[in-house]
Amino acid sequence: MCKEEDITHGQRFLLGLMDKRELAQFCRDHDFSLVFLFNVGIGKNLPPAETIYKLRHVIHPNSWFYKEGESVALSEYSQDTGDTWKYMESKGYRKLLSIVENKGDRNFAREHGFDYTSLWLILTGKRKPSYLKICSYKDHITPSDWFFKE
C-alpha cells in the first residue's frame, strides 16, 4: 500500500469507494475488473492511460497525476465520446508536436532529460505514451490534454 502522502486524487476517489464498499458496483458499471481497480487504488499498480481515458468523465484525468496536497487544475473539456483512446487526436499530442517543431525533437529530449527514442516512438504513433511518460511531460503539457480532443 502507498504511503498516505503518495496517494493521488484519483486513488483517493477509489479508496473512498472502497471505504463505502461501492467499488465492486463501480467496476461493474464501468466494465473493469475489481482486482485491477483495487490494486490501482492501493497503489500496487499504476493506472494505464487507457484506463484513465475510459474513466475520464467520472475521474478527471489530472486527478491521477497529482498527489494529495498538490493543487489540481480540473480543466473544462469537451464531452467527446468513444471508448478507444486515440492519443494522436488529443490536445496533448498537438502540443507535443508544436513544442518539438519549435525546439527540434532531439534538442527537446536533450534539454529535459527525456529519452529520444521514446519521444520519437510517441511522435510517430508507434507507441502510446504511458502513465510515466505523461507524468514526465506534465511540466510542458497538462496531463488531461492527452485524453481530450481539441
PLM ranges: what are they?
Residues 1-23, 29, 74-103, 111:
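A short, Lys/Arg-rich alpha-helix, primarily the initiator
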Residues 31-47, 114-129:
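Recognition helix of helix-turn-helix/homeodomain-like DNA-binding domains
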Residues 7-11, 23, 48, 52, ...:
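Short amphipathic alpha-helical segments that mediate assembly, nucleic-acid/protein binding
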Residues 44-56, 126-138:
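Short, basic-rich loop-to-helix N-cap that marks the start of a DNA-contacting helix
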Residues 59-80, 141-150:
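Short C-terminal boundary/hinge segments that cap the last helix of small helical domains
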Residues 24-25, 53, 106-107:
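Residues within the helices of the helix-turn-helix
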Residues 38-39, 53, 66, 120-121, ...:
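Key DNA-contacting residues within the recognition helix of helix-turn-helix
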